[in-house]
């Protein structure tokens, strides 16, 4: 069903350097989702990036972001980048390496990059880092371009 929605043009679209369009309800980037992260990505060079500060609603242990939320940050940095470049893509495989606890209430820098491409298959990587450059999580994904 989701692939059919993408092919019909109902998937997330990016414009204005990363601002989400469409129904604006994407959990990661949609501005109209009251529970969403409202990430505002931009393209800088070969990176898709944003900064955010996670609220307490997204914590696991006291003061630490839930791993699923951190995984969402990484996935959006990778998949969203391809969509921002005008390609409709889905995540085929996602792996995450948690290096350090990701804190709640501190500025985080999220970056996604294309590592390699073979036809419709794109390998991507992403990081979540603190303001001082400490990487708290790394992601790698195999994305599939569906159109």
What are these regions (language model features)?
Residues 37, 48, 90-92, 108, ...:
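Hydrophobic core residues within well-ordered beta-strands of beta-rich domains
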Residues 49-72:
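A conserved, well-ordered hydrophobic junction motif at loop->secondary-structure transitions
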Residues 42-44, 99, 144-146:
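A structural detector for beta-sheet-dominated domains
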Residues 33, 70-71, 82-83, 115:
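Short, flexible micro-motifs
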Residues 76-109:
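Hydrophobic beta-strand-centered segment that forms part of the acyl-chain substrate-binding groove
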Residues 1-57:
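Non-catalytic linker/capping segments at the edges of enzyme domains
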Residues 51-53, 95-97, 111-113, 127, ...:
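Residue-level recognition of well-ordered beta-strand positions that form the cores
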Residues 2-19, 102-104, 114-147:
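HotDog/MaoC-like acyl-thioester-processing domains
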């Amino acid at each position: 069903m989701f692939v059919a929605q993408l092919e019909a043009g109902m998937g997330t679209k990016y414009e204005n350097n990363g601002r989400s369009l469409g129904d604006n309800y994407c959990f990661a980037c949609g501005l109209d989702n009251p529970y969403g992260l409202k990430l505002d990505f931009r393209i800088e060079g070969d990176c898709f990036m944003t900064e955010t500060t996670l609220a307490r609603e997204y914590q696991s242990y006291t003061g630490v972001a839930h791993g699923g939320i951190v995984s969402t940050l990484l996935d959006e940095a990778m998949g969203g980048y391809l969509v921002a470049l005008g390609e409709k893509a889905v995540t085929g495989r996602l792996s995450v390496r948690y290096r350090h606890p990701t804190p709640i209430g501190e500025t985080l820098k999220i970056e996604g990059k294309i590592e390699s491409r073979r036809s419709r298959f794109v390998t991507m990587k992403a990081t979540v880092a603190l303001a001082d450059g400490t990487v708290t999580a790394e992601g790698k994904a195999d994305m599939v371009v569906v159109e």
